Structures are given as structure tokens and as C-alpha cells.
Curated annotation (Swiss-Prot):
Pfam family, one: IMS_HHH_1
Name of this chain's protein: DNA polymerase IV
Reaction equation(s) it catalyzes: DNA(n) + a 2'-deoxyribonucleoside 5'-triphosphate = DNA(n+1) + diphosphate
Role: Poorly processive, error-prone DNA polymerase involved in untargeted mutagenesis. Copies undamaged DNA at stalled replication forks, which arise in vivo from mismatched or misaligned primer ends. These misaligned primers can be extended by PolIV. Exhibits no 3'-5' exonuclease (proofreading) activity. May be involved in translesional synthesis, in conjunction with the beta clamp from PolIII.
Provenance organism: Vibrio parahaemolyticus serotype O3:K6 (strain RIMD 2210633)
Listed PANTHER family: DNA POLYMERASE KAPPA, DNA REPAIR POLYMERASE UMUC / TRANSFERASE FAMILY MEMBER
Superkingdom, taxonomy of origin: Bacteria
Organism taxonomic ancestry: Bacteria, Pseudomonadati, Pseudomonadota, Gammaproteobacteria, Vibrionales
Gene Ontology terms describing biological process: DNA-templated DNA replication; error-prone translesion synthesis; SOS response
HAMAP family: DNApol_IV (MF_01113)
UniProt EC number: 2.7.7.7
SUPFAM superfamilies tied to this protein: DNA/RNA polymerases, Lesion bypass DNA polymerase (Y-family), little finger domain
Segments forming domain UmuC: 8-189
Gene3D superfamilies in the record: 3.30.70.270, 3.40.1170.60, 5' to 3' exonuclease, C-terminal subdomain, DNA polymerase, Y-family, little finger domain
């Protein structure tokens, strides 16, 4: 008996934060616009509209750099409470078509419409109808990807942006995957991509035609995952309830810092108290698995360190801080963050019985 073919849609709002600002303020519609932090406060760009992207402005770019590329760029502060409200409105539109919704962020989600009856059960028509509803009711545009597996649905949603959609039918999966650059696979970052290129891998087809054991030897678990993706395999389900996995706080400094004492003062007085508050909201019994520190140096290199610990402890961050600063090599520090990985809910419930 053949396995049932799934119908997965990935919906991705077009430059979401900036689009909301342009919708709510008509004066913003024909100018280069970004949502982000102030350049004097070492801010970064959260998102920008397509006019700004013509000049090379991108998300996560320092605001100062964005203004160098586009001097007439208007940078406005974010209104997160508004974006959350709009995200709930988008979610309500999704729920007209399916209950199998996996939000990835405020502006994107996976939908499983395999058993949906709307639009005669056509995933293509459902995606089109959802996008029309969003445009007509909310004044925003969305792009969508339709495929039988999750990672390809996400890839497809980027193929006809903005305000478009792209379908990868089951019989075309391997053909599309073969020609897919490895950087298009979700989860392949800059460092991983560089290592893959050094090993001679550029397309999924290169991975598909390689030796599986050699991939494992060179790239470990990522090698195994890439091998599956390159063969058009992605068994992941659309997860309706996404359990929160981590809690974190961070601070970008208006002036770089450099010493252990400066870092510890920020941790003790600012970051740790805020982390405690957030952990209390996310996990009242404060059950965790790991705690860690993140540092971004002045050259924008990011490094993290963590260790296993069942409870949040301020003193444990001292050793982590000493260890992570061994990687400093004379560089100043631009950003400092703390995080904890939460214990899975089921595991926490089981432990509470004893």
C-alpha cells in the first residue's frame, strides 16, 4: 500500500513589519522604509520594504550600515503589540481552512491541508484563497509555497515573492531538489555552507550522489539530514502545538565593553533578573536542562557556550563567562546574552511525580 501524499502549505508574509507600517501610514508606501533600532543605539534592522532592498538593505543588518547603503532610508521603531494583533488575525484566516497549523513566527506558518475540504481539497486553491483573504481583509500580502514535504514548501514560498505562490507537485520533487543550491535548505548557515563548498558540495544533487558514510564522517548529523533532504525525504509532521524550548535575554551595547568585570556587572544587574522573570512566566517550576551565554564581538562574530544544569543559578554563569571570554582574542564585545533550555513538558510532569 503506497503512503498517502501530503499537502503542505508554507505561508510567509511579505516584509511583514514594514508592510504593516506602510498599511497604517500611507506616507511610507513609496519610500525606502525599515523597522529597526536607532543607529546611535547600535540598533539593527528587523525588516525592510522592497524599495529599501533595492539598495542592499537586509534584515539583521546594523542600522548604521543600512543608512550607509541607503542614506534616505527611513527607520521607524517597531510596534510589536500591533504586529502580534495582526498575526492573530492571520491565524484566524488560516483556521477557516485547517486546524493543522504550525506557527514559526509572527509572520510565517506551515499548514497541513491534506484532509481539507475547502476549495475542493486543492492545496493550490486553498493557498490562493488564504492570500486573497489576507489581502482583502488585512491590506497585506503573503507568499506561499505548496509541496508534499515541509522543507520544500518553505523553499517554494520564496520562489515567487512578493505576493505570489509556487507549487512543487509530487512528481517534480526530485527534479527540483537536484538543482537546489545547498544554501536554500533551511538550517544550512554560513559556516556550514563554507565547509560544504570546501568539500565540493554546491547542489543537493552533489549530496545525493555522494557516499552516505563519508557524509556522516565529515558532517555528522547534519550530513545525515542533508542526505535525506537531497533525496526528497522529509518525514516531519506539521506540529500543531509548538512547545517553547528556550528562554533568553540579550543586550546590545551603545558602547562596546571588553572586561570580565564589565560583562559580569551587566549579567548580575540587568540580564539575570530579566531572565528570571521570563523563566518564571515560561516555566513556573523553573525546570531547565541547560543554561548558556552568547557573545557577539565587535567584528560581528557570534559565539555561544552552555552547560547542563537542572536549575537556573547565577553563580554558574561566572564559569561560563570566564570560558567564553577565552575566545575574545582582544576583541571588544558588542552584545551579551543569557539563555536557558527548558525541560520538555512531558519530562517535567514525569519528574514531578517523585
Amino acid at each position: 500500500m503506497s503512503e498517502r501524499i501530503r499537502k503542505i502549505i508554507h505561508v510567509d508574509m511579505d516584509c511583514f513589519y514594514a508592510a504593516v507600517e506602510m498599511r497604517d501610514n500611507p506616507n511610507y508606501r513609496d519610500i525606502a522604509l525599515a523597522v529597526g533600532g536607532h543607529e546611535k543605539q547600535r540598533g539593527v534592522i528587523s525588516t525592510c520594504n522592497y524599495e529599501a532592498r533595492k539598495f542592499g538593505v537586509r534584515s539583521a543588518m546594523p542600522t548604521a550600515r543600512a543608512l550607509q547603503l541607503c542614506p534616505h532610508l527611513l527607520v521607524v521603531p517597531g510596534r510589536m503589540h500591533i504586529y502580534k494583533q495582526v498575526s492573530l488575525q492571520i491565524r484566524a484566516i488560516f483556521e477557516r481552512y485547517t486546524s493543522l497549523i504550525e506557527p514559526l513566527s509572527l509572520d510565517e506558518a506551515y499548514l497541513d491541508v491534506t484532509d481539507a475540504t475547502a476549495c475542493r481539497g486543492s492545496a493550490t486553491l486553498i493557498a490562493e484563497s488564504i492570500r486573497n483573504d489576507i489581502r482583502n481583509e488585512l491590506g497585506l500580502t503573503a507568499s506561499a509555497g505548496i509541496a508534499p514535504i515541509k522543507f520544500l514548501a518553505k523553499v517554494a514560498s520564496d520562489m515567487n515573492k512578493p505576493n505570489g505562490q509556487f507549487v512543487i507537485p509530487p512528481e517534480k520533487v526530485q527534479e527540483v531538489v537536484d538543482k537546489l543550491p545547498l544554501e536554500k535548505i533551511p538550517g544550512v548557515g554560513k559556516v556550514s555552507l563554507e565547509k560544504l563548498h570546501q568539500a565540493g558540495f554546491y547542489l543537493c544533487e552533489d549530496i545525493k550522489n555522494s557516499d552516505y558514510r563519508e557524509l556522516l564522517r565529515q558532517f555528522g548529523r547534519q550530513g545525515a539530514s542533508l542526505w535525506k533532504r537531497s533525496h526528497g525525504i522529509d518525514d516531519r509532521e506539521v506540529v500543531v502545538e509548538r512547545e517553547r524550548k528556550s528562554v533568553g535575554v540579550e543586550r546590545t551595547f551603545s558602547q562596546n565593553i571588553s572586561t570580565y568585570d564589565e560583562c559580569w556587572q551587566v549579567i548580575e544587574e540587568k540580564l539575570y533578573p530579566e531572565l528570571e522573570k521570563r523563566l518564571e512566566r515560561a516555566s513556573p517550576d523553573k525546570s531547565i536542562i541547560k543554561q548558556g551565554i552568547k557573545v557577539k564581538f565587535a567584528d560581528f562574530q557570534l559565539t555561544t557556550i552552555e552547560h547542563i544544569h537542572p536549575q537556573l543559578e547565577l553563580e554558574d554563569f561566572k564559569l561560563l563567562l570566564k570560558d567564553i571570554l577565552k575566545r575574545q582574542n582582544g576583541r571588544e564585545i558588542r552584545l551579551l546574552g543569557l539563555s536557558v533550555m527548558l525541560k520538555p513538558e512531558e519530562q517535567a510532569r514525569q519528574l514531578s511525580f517523585f
